[in-house]
Each structure stands twice: as C-alpha cells, then as structure tokens.
Amino acid sequence: MIPVINQEKQGISGDFRLSVAPMMNWTDRYCRVFHRVLAPSARLYTEMVHAKAVIYGDRERLLGFASVEQPVALQLGGSEPALLAKAASIAVDWGYSEINLNCGCPSDRVQAGSFGACLMREPALVADCVAAMAAVVSVPVTVKCRLGVNEDDDYGRFAKFVDWVIGASSSRMIVVHARNAWLQGLSPKENREIPPLRYDWVYRLKRECPELAVVLNGGITSVEAGLDHLLMVDGVMLGRAAYQDPYILHQFYCALSNAPVLPRALLLRALRPYVEAWLEQGVTLRHIVRHLLGLFHGQPGGRVFRQVLTQGGQRSDADWSLVEQALSIIEG
C-alpha cells in the first residue's frame, strides 16, 4: 500500500503521487487531455512557457486549456522575479492550479536566456523568483530542478539549493530530475539519458526533510519501478515513458487507485468528444493524433496503427473516422 501524505500540510491540493512531466513540443493541450483520460487524478504540466511570452504573447494559444485537465500546472521559464510574478498572476487568472519554475532545462537556447538548469548555480536568485511569485498568487509555487550542473558531486550543495527554494515558498514541494544537467557538450536529449541517475540523493533528501513533499523524475519506465520509488518519496513524475508508451500512465493510475485497467481502444474512444470539438474549432487532426501514436506500443498491429494515423492525419479533411480506421486494424 502506497501512503498518501497530508497534501494540505504541503500547501498542495490533490494527489501528487503520479504526475506527467512538462515536455517541450509534447505536453500541449491535446496531449494533456489524452493523459487525463488515461489517468483521471494525475497532475499534469504544460510545456515550459517563458514569462515574457505569457505577458506579451498570445495568451489563448499559450495558456488555454480544458477544465477536464485540472489539476494542471503551468511551468514557467525565466530568471527575473518581477516578470515571473506578473506571469504567474496572469496564469492564475487563467485558472492554473500550480506554478512551476523550470530549473532543469539544459538547452543552449535556455542557457542563453539565463534560465533553466543554469539557475541551480544561483539559489538566492531562484529563491527571489519563487518568493516574488508566491507573494502574488494563492496557488502553490514549486520548482523542478536537477541534482546539480556539470560535474557537481556535492549533495550538500544540492540540499542547500532546496533549502533556499523551499524557504521562499509557502509550498513545501519540489520535483527533482535525479541526474545532473551538463551545460556543455550534450544535447537536451542526451542530457535526459547520459548523466547517471542518482536516486539515492533524492531518497536522502526525503529522509532528511520528512515534511517536504519530494517528487522524483527521471528514468522511470515501468509501473513496478514507479511503485518502488513511492516507498521512498511522495510522488513520481513520468516523462518520456508516458508519451512513448502512454498505456503505462493508465496502468500506473489504476495501480494507485485500485481501479480496473481498461482496454486501450476503450480509452481512445473516450477521447472522441474532445477530438470532435477541436476539429469543429478548426484544429487539424494531425496536431492531435501525433500524441496517440504510442498507445499500442508493442502490441500486434501497433506499427500499422501508427502509420494510418501519421499518413492520414496529414489530410486537411481528416476526422475521427481515421482513428476508427486505425482501431479496426487493432481489433481485426
């Protein structure tokens, strides 16, 4: 039995034992609704949005979401406390239930903007950013970080960073990608795979800070592994596994909630009302079905299922019948 800690004490509402990581170019509004169908209580996160984009950009495109997505958090990028505070205030007006600051992205573009993983070298600045946002919003302000940058091998430095962050926020929760970020020499993809995982550091953080809600991210590719982590920390955050093999997300949700595991086809058909509503709004099917391609990962007919959706989804007039065509291959 996986314990549920007192979320109210942590300043977080809802169940955070299971969440889906913010992933650039992946966790858009269509992906998040699909994930909500698969896991009704998982915490969902947007793609990272820079604070300036929230303030000056197309807010409907950047911030719009369906009410069914709740609880959903907006992940912000930036390093200027005043701008982050303004963006957080706007986001809360749009209905987001959590604001999360990105302190883990190692891409060159993000580094050039002085935010993301490079902020781990500036814990006082991160604390200022968190405090500025927490002062103007009523929802939790959290941080997603790495263990350190480059060759950092000092647990004490990591723990000090967490102390700074938590001390600045009314929300005692942190999400940790359990590996370092290399700021030179590795692509973002390689940064998710090559730096070694150090789950022991995250476990230690939880042991030393029992009142802190610790959510672990990184390298979780099975329900069994996730459940094992939940014996040591308060939550797990699935990343690529939830996108590339999304049925894992449903299986994990069912394991935590003692709900029956539903067939893949039934879950996909539950998405139909949302898909048809989006199509009526002028969204083309290809923007939606790209998130569905992994649902039959490893299953007979899965490759042809993906081909039908990928090729047919390019048509401007493609509609739900294409999904049914792809399902007919699976169902024989």
UniProtKB/Swiss-Prot annotation:
It catalyses: 5,6-dihydrouridine(20) in tRNA + NADP(+) = uridine(20) in tRNA + NADPH + H(+); 5,6-dihydrouridine(20) in tRNA + NAD(+) = uridine(20) in tRNA + NADH + H(+); 5,6-dihydrouridine(20a) in tRNA + NADP(+) = uridine(20a) in tRNA + NADPH + H(+); 5,6-dihydrouridine(20a) in tRNA + NAD(+) = uridine(20a) in tRNA + NADH + H(+). Its cofactor is FMN. Pfam families: Dus (PF01207). GO terms for molecular function: flavin adenine dinucleotide binding; FMN binding; tRNA binding; tRNA-dihydrouridine20 synthase activity; tRNA-dihydrouridine20a synthase activity. The active site is at residue 105. The record marks 102, 189, 192, 303, 306 as: Interacts with tRNA. InterPro entries: Aldolase_TIM (IPR013785), DUS-like_FMN-bd (IPR035587), DUS_fam (IPR001269), DusA (IPR004653), tRNA_hU_synthase_CS (IPR018517). It is an enzyme of class 1 (oxidoreductase). SUPFAM superfamilies: FMN-linked oxidoreductases (SSF51395). Keywords: Flavoprotein, FMN, NADP, Oxidoreductase, RNA-binding, tRNA processing, tRNA-binding. Its EC number is 1.3.1.-, 1.3.1.91. FMN binds at residues 22-24, 75, 144, 177, 217-219, 239-240. NCBIfam families: PRK11815.1 (NF008774). Belongs to the Dus family. DusA subfamily. PANTHER family: FMN-LINKED OXIDOREDUCTASES SUPERFAMILY PROTEIN. Catalyzes the synthesis of 5,6-dihydrouridine (D), a modified base found in the D-loop of most tRNAs, via the reduction of the C5-C6 double bond in target uridines. Specifically modifies U20 and U20a in tRNAs. This is tRNA-dihydrouridine(20/20a) synthase. It comes from Xylella fastidiosa (strain Temecula1 / ATCC 700964).
